[in-house]
Every structure is written in C-alpha cells, then in structure tokens.
Amino acid sequence: GNINDVTDVSDDGDDTDGNTIDDPTVVEISPSPSIEATKIAEVLDDNADDKTGPGDIINYTITIENTGNIEVTDLNLIDTMTDGNGKPRTLTTGPTYVSSSLNSQRGTLQVGEIANYIASYKIKDSDVEGARIENSILAIASSPNNSGDVTDVSDNGIDTDDNTIDDPTVIMITYVRKYFEIFNLVTPNGDGLNDYFELRGIENFGPNEVKIYN
C-alpha cells in the first residue's frame, strides 16, 4: 500500500491579523527588570576575648541577584553604615567585586546571575557607646535604554527575624568598657559619708597592687 505523509505548520488562530495560515503564535513579554541585594556579616574575634568589640573585624558578604527577565548593566553599590546612635561610619575595605555566577563582566548581570562582593569594618573604641553597627547597601543598575532605574536595598539574609525585606545587617557590640575610679575625699569621722578610701573597678585590671604615699 501507499504511505502518505501529512504535515501542517501551526496557525495562531487569529484570522484578523492579515495572516490566516501557518503564522507563528507570538506572546509578547514585557520587560520586568529587578535585582535583589543581600548582605551577611560574620565577626572575626581578633583578640580572642569571646566578645565583639574594639579591634574585631566584621566581614561582610554581599550578593546581588538579577531576579528580573532582562539583563541589567552599570551595577553600582552605595554603602550606608551607622552606629547605634545614628553616627555615620565608613567601611574599612570594599565593597570589592569577587565573581559572578555566569562570568559576566563586572557591573553586568544576566537573568538569574548572581554577583559576589566582600567588605569589612574594623570596630573602633568609639563604637562601644553605640552598642551596635548597622549596615546596608543600595544596589543600582540600569535596564536597556534606561539609566539607574533598577534599585534594591539589601536584606540581612535572615528570614526568621520577622523582617524579610530591606532590613539592615546589624552586629551587636558585646564588649563592656572597663572603668577605674579613685575617690580622693576621705573623712573618717563616723558619719557614714566618705569614711573609707575607695577604689572602684580595680578588679578589672588585675593583677594589681595599691601603694599610698603621704
């Protein structure tokens, strides 16, 4: 018997478009650029005192992901850092570009691509009063034919803190400043006021000894 092959190319079903046979089905995809920034912190206890305080290093890992459906370019990062009293602070190093998941040039992100950056901050003695360091980063990129239209403020990467978007990365300072105070007024007259020579906080600076000279 004879074998007859029957073929057909699909039609889009729209006979009002001036093409009634074998025309492709076209779906228009609207550009939707977006990025997501995340900043995670880890403390290096430089003096090994088991406290977060002066001299310790806060190491930041920053990721910027293209979560939209088109490529973005001209990616820039603007860092904002303050202590617990709102006083501005500045990163010690970075942000420094490290790599990207799809090997694009620095500043360019393909769809789904993630760029990685690092930064650090060395805690100062003046930071103790504020009790914490707050840090966030603003990522700014451009979609095709636009400039600086794609932005995101970093999240801290912790989704169990009841704040899943745009929350700053916070490091608490657990170091407590040591004090030493000498009271130079002594009136040993039994009235209950200044009857004894007193040193406060000397236990914070041991071993020690006290010598009194007339």
Regions found by a protein language model. Name each.
Residues 1-179:
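Exported/extracytosolic protein signature
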Residues 175-214:
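Short loop/turn motifs at secondary-structure boundaries
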